[in-house]
């Protein structure tokens, strides 16, 4: 469990720094799981046919009869076998879940859904769980309050996790509690960073989505969405991996634990099961909890700001419409700013549809600029950095990992708007990286103001052998006495 870090940055939501949304791309987490070549199905059919012929011949030798009699006898045996299998299928119970599993499933599904728990930071050290309960009960029904304490001293760490019964109440808590004064301190409130999405690899590539779904739903409860990635060159086959979304973290972790067991197989394959990096959501940070702007895409050409204002003002007061120029001088997107966040939330409800001149618009909440640095597919405007997520146990009793955590080799670094100088943060404004040829033939890069002359390469230090080659005759040991005067200035090199 990691300690919370105080972050006193403030977000300027009126600053108009905008950037265009790119097409969202699924994170590539599967390079090591893709095979280079597929075995030819025809070879398998031939092999099976040859094996069947050998089996018939062996059977005929054992019976001592001719081949026609043997084939008739095999056909009769097959008919009997099919009848027996059909009878067995009819006798199977409708569900493989026993009473113990059914009770466990009910418990997992009774826990609050994903997105119903909030993180509260910046708490005074003398605040107890009852104080937090009194603070949050005014907002809505609480499922659980967990104040994080030091394991050794038992003192409060200054942050807590509060699980509400529903996601709507959790969102309301973020709006009301973030930046609120509580017992003399300004507290922070954002969604708790738990995971509810699994990546599953090494799936048989001939499986259909229905076959895969049946197996996954038998493993555990709470499956909400299954995305089995299809092979683009052959739609009858999959690429060997999938993403599964669960009702909450507890359901996801229950299934994960069962599937990583060495005895669990997918048609003989041992699956790879890890937490998937979630698709970004505008509600996942304290800064985003204050967003009052919409990102609107597919705006027809020559659409005026007055048309957009008239379209969206039915949800509340619109303070301004911003339509920045896009790439190549064309613009098909814009930002609608409301006076209240509640108006923006109403505007993005699933029941709302928008059209201009018969063309449907895409409307979502805008994102702060800081979040876009880690999500190149997002759409954003100026904002300051937000607190980092925290690793903590969830109310389901299972350990959770933070969103975007680098784990299992699946994390993919986000893009940055400018190069990073390791250990020094972002590159200073106005500077650029300039290539420079080093004496040993390698190419290095240095920071330099634009228009400045190329930086000179540092002089190459003579090698040890070169220093000894200055005098003729004698061994290197003898000649080294000539350089005793300089030995004191040389760095000691043990190897």
From Swiss-Prot:
Subcellular location: Nucleus; Cytoplasm; Microsome
Disordered, as annotated region: 1-101, 452-495
Domain of life: Eukaryota
Listed SUPFAM superfamilies: RNA-binding domain, RBD
Classification via SMART domains: RRM, RRM_1
InterPro entries: Nucleotide-bd_a/b_plait_sf, RBD_domain_sf, RRM_dom, RRM_dom_euk
GO MF entries: chromatin binding; mRNA binding; sequence-specific DNA binding
Chain ranges of the RRM domain: 116-194, 196-278, 292-368
Compositionally biased residues, Basic and acidic residues: 1-10, 478-487
Known partners and oligomeric status: Interacts with LHP1 in the nucleus on a common set of chromatin regions.
Described purpose of this protein according to its UniProt entry: Transcriptional activator that binds DNA on GAGA-like motif and 5'-(C/G)ACGTG(G/T)C(A/G)-3' consensus motif in the promoters of target genes. Component of ribonucleosomes, which are complexes of at least 20 other different heterogeneous nuclear ribonucleoproteins (hnRNP). hnRNP play an important role in processing of precursor mRNA in the nucleus. Required during flower development and for cell fate determination.
Record protein name field: Heterogeneous nuclear ribonucleoprotein Q
Organism the protein comes from: Arabidopsis thaliana
UniProt lineage: Eukaryota, Viridiplantae, Streptophyta, Embryophyta, Tracheophyta
């Amino acid at each position: 469990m990691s300690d919370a870090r105080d972050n006193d940055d403030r977000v300027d939501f009126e600053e108009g720094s905008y950037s265009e949304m790119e097409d969202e791309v699924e994170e590539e987490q599967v390079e090591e799981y893709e095979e280079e070549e597929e075995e030819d199905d025809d070879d398998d059919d031939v092999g099976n046919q040859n094996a069947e012929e050998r089996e018939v011949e062996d059977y005929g030798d054992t019976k001592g009869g001719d081949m026609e009699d043997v084939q008739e006898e095999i056909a009769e045996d097959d008919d009997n076998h099919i009848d027996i299998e059909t009878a067995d299928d009819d006798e199977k119970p409708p569900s493989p879940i026993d009473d113990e599993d059914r009770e466990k499933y009910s418990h997992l599904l009774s826990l609050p859904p994903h997105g119903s728990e909030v993180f509260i930071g910046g708490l005074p050290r003398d605040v107890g769980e009852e104080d937090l309960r009194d603070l949050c009960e005014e907002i809505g029904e609480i499922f659980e309050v967990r104040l994080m304490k030091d394991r050794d001293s038992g003192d409060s760490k200054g942050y807590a996790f509060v699980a509400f019964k529903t996601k709507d109440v959790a969102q309301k808590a973020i709006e009301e509690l973030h930046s609120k004064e509580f017992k003399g301190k300004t507290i922070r409130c954002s969604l708790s960073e738990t995971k509810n999405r699994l990546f599953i690899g090494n799936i048989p590539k001939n499986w259909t989505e229905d076959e895969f779904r049946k197996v996954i739903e038998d493993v555990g409860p709470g499956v909400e969405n299954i995305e089995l990635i299809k092979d683009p060159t052959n739609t009858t086959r999959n690429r060997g991996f999938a993403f599964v979304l669960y009702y909450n973290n507890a359901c996801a972790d229950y299934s994960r634990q069962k599937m990583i067991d060495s005895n669990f197989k997918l048609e003989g394959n041992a699956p790879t099961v890890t937490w998937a990096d979630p698709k970004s959501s505008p509600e996942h940070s304290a800064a985003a909890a204050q967003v009052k702007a919409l990102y609107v895409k597919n705006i027809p050409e020559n659409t005026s700001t007055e048309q957009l204002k008239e379209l969206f003002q039915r949800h509340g007061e619109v303070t301004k419409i911003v339509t920045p120029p896009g790439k190549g001088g064309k613009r098909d997107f814009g930002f609608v700013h409301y006076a209240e966040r509640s108006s923006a939330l109403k505007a993005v409800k699933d029941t709302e549809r928008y059209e201009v001149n018969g063309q449907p618009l895409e409307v979502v909440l805008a994102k702060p600029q800081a979040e876009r640095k880690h999500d190149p597919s997002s759409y954003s405007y100026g904002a300051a950095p937000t607190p980092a997520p925290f690793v903590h146990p969830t109310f389901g009793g299972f350990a959770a990992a933070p969103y975007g955590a680098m784990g299992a080799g699946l994390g993919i670094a986000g893009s940055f708007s400018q190069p990073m100088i390791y250990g020094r943060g972002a590159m200073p404004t106005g500077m650029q990286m300039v290539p420079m040829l080093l004496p040993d033939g390698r190419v290095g890069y240095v920071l330099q103001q634009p228009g400045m002359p190329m930086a000179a390469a540092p002089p190459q230090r003579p090698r040890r052998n070169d220093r000894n080659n200055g005098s003729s005759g004698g061994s290197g040991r003898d000649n080294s006495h000539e350089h005793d005067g300089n030995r004191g200035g040389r760095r000691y090199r043990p190897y």
